[in-house]
Amino acid sequence: MNTYELISSLKIKQQIGKLPNTISSISHNSRQVDDNSLFICISGFTVDGHNFVAEAVENGATCIVAEREVNLDTNKATLIIVPDTNKAIATLAATFYKHPSHNLTIYGVTGTNGKTTVTTIINHLLTDNELSTALIGTNGFQINKDIYSSSNNTTSDVLTNQHMLYEAKNQGVTHVAMEVSSHGLEQGRLWGIDFTVATFTNLSHEHLDYHGSMEEYAATKVQLFSSLAIQPNKQKIAVLNRDDNWYEYFQKRTPVQIVSYGIYEQADFRATAIKYYKDRTSFELLTPEGSFQVQTKLMGEFNVYNVLAAIASVYVKESIPLTDLVKSIEGTPTPPGRMEKLESSGNRHIYIDYAHTPDALTKAINSLLPFKQNKLIVVVGTGGDRDKSIRPLLAKAASVADYVILTINDPRHEDPNNILQDLENGMLHHQYTCLENRKEAIREAINYSSPNDIILIAGKGKEPYQIIKNKKVAHNDATIALECSNELFPNI
């Protein structure tokens, strides 16, 4: 790309050296730089890109964007100094990839819980009604039904996001469903993306180690909505959960058309006459266009909210007949690792769920309680080097179960015994055990169980690894549960 065109939107404080004519790529990782690249120095939580300029130049960078002067041979590379490289990288990424979001309908979904399920349902509704789609979030990057990459974060970095949108647009995609995390918003990973529809699921206790308070957490989440009017080139719509305690906070800070959904409060899209079954949920959908009978394979009240959010989001933008959307809902698959029931031996009912917050765990357990014939056994853990205040609340939520196994999701660098002790502090009864090894915890749950027991393995969903210190160690809850079940009950 022409270098002058690329940097034209930057706020440049100083330029040292002659600009190269063209730039072949952009990177903030000095190890991924190639010939004729632009390297941008980002100050992260653990490393500072300004310290890796020499390596970037050695690998082929011909232009360096930084916040301060660095040791650089300007005969080899040009130095551009800007006030804020986090904002600069968003501008550069959008420009380099030719602002793909301007020509896409992008659904952004944020909230503490439900982002993956709602984006999955939105994606299904769109593809089922013959629209070309991309899905971006916790489970990776998908165009139509082809999976292109996995993801380490709910919201990828700004360069990756723009590149994914660029690839999607080039492959004929017209609509994108995208998860939007609070970290992604706070760290500017979504700057430069022109969202069309913003959907709010709910807000509850999470990430307070990072945000400090629920008020700061909400202020970060609401950025998705307050920024909708910045790009006036599209009709923008916000879809809000009328039943959530933070509804009015989001409503007051949203400068575009608002559509509401809910169960208990009056809303534009409302579910009533809800019936829960072992393998499905049904309800009557009340809308401005009349009422419709909805059937879904998804379980629990929280999934009724997820279905409502998705239907409202798609209908208000696409005007697809509600009869068609309701029909499509019947075929919506359960997202992997989201209240996913395993086909296991031993006549045990084993569910894998990503629930890793007190609110999500409570809702997952409540969705199973009506079908409890014998015992409910819950495996619950939490991660190291993360919000400690959430730990006793998770154990308290799990205490509804007949037997609880406390374990660890991703210990990272923290002492596992400290994590387990924090969890124990929230237990309300003595029918529990602590097992540091997550595989052993899953095995204990299955071994302790009897026929017709329900086993909920919560916290990691479909994640294929555990983070132990700096290493990712292969681990998948569903795979381990099936292995243990088949080993313990081979002939049942």
Swiss-Prot record:
Positions carrying N6-carboxylysine are K221
What Gene3D superfamilies does the record point to? Mur ligase, C-terminal domain, Mur-like, catalytic domain, MurE/MurF, N-terminal domain
- Indicate what this protein is called per its UniProt record: UDP-N-acetylmuramyl-tripeptide synthetase 2
To which species is this protein native?
Answer: Oceanobacillus iheyensis (strain DSM 14371 / CIP 107618 / JCM 11309 / KCTC 3954 / HTE831)
NCBIfam families, per database record: murE (TIGR01085), PRK00139.1-4 (NF001126)
**Gene that this sequence comes from:** murE2
**What GO cellular-component annotations does this UniProt entry give?**
cytoplasm
Its subcellular locations are: Cytoplasm
What are the recorded GO MF terms, alphabetically? acid-amino acid ligase activity; ATP binding; magnesium ion binding
